């Protein structure tokens, strides 16, 4: 089966997003990333967060992406997820504190029943290789977003091979 995810990059205002979420549900879209711009929840009550309102009443699952970037304090991460309660979070290790920062997000998300997946953020093949290995040890069965290496014209050679919808590393590597 083919599964579609939509990345809005915060393009919609709240009212537009509410309508769009209904339309996407009718199309059986897996999820939408960051439908409205990043919100500030540090000093906000859950009932005042527009993203939390969307996540609480959405017919299409919402994944936070840009919302996670720049938050390094464990308690702030926890408050963000407890406040917004998204269906998914998307982790770009290079932008969320590396592998240790990703581990914190994963731990908090799993404790709150929030699913997650990992994507790359324009890493070269060296960075992509490390992220692929990190993702593998996490044993998350959701499709991950790890295909940016081919975008570069001047990149390092890689031993990673895409077979169907899976990334493989030959045994002799």
Model-found features: residue ranges?
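Metal-dependent enolase-superfamily TIM-barrel catalytic cores that perform enediolate-based chemistry
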Residues: 1-58, 69
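Hydrophobic faces of well-ordered beta-strands that scaffold small-molecule active sites
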Residues: 2-8, 32-34, 62-65, 89-91, ...
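Catalytic cores of alpha/beta
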Residues: 14-24, 70-84, 100-106, 124-139
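Glycine-enriched alpha-helix->loop->beta-strand junction motifs that scaffold or abut catalytic
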Residues: 22-30, 53-62, 81-89, 108-115, ...
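A polyampholytic, Gly/Pro-enriched intrinsically disordered region
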Residues: 61-62, 85-93, 164-171
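Short coil/turn segments
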Residues: 67-68, 94-95
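Active-site capping/gating regions of soluble enzymes
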Residues: 84-89, 95, 101-117, 121, ...
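Flexible C-terminal active-site loop/helix
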Residues: 121-173
């Amino acid at each position: 089966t083919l599964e579609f995810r939509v990345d809005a990059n915060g393009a919609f205002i709240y009212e537009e997003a509410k309508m769009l979420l209904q339309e996407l549900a009718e199309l059986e879209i897996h999820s939408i990333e960051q439908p409205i711009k990043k919100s500030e929840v540090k000093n906000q009550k859950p009932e005042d967060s527009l993203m939390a309102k969307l996540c609480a009443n959405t017919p299409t699952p919402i994944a936070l992406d840009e919302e996670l970037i720049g938050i390094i304090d464990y308690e702030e991460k926890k408050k963000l997820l407890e406040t917004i309660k998204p269906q998914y979070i998307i982790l770009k290790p290079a932008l969320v504190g590396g592998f240790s920062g990703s581990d914190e997000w994963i731990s908090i998300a799993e404790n709150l029943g929030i699913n997650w997946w990992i994507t790359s953020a324009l890493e070269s093949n060296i960075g992509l290789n490390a992220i692929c290995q990190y993702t593998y040890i996490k044993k998350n069965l959701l499709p991950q977003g790890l295909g940016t290496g081919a975008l570069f014209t001047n990149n390092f050679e890689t031993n990673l091979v895409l077979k169907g919808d899976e990334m493989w590393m030959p045994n002799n590597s």
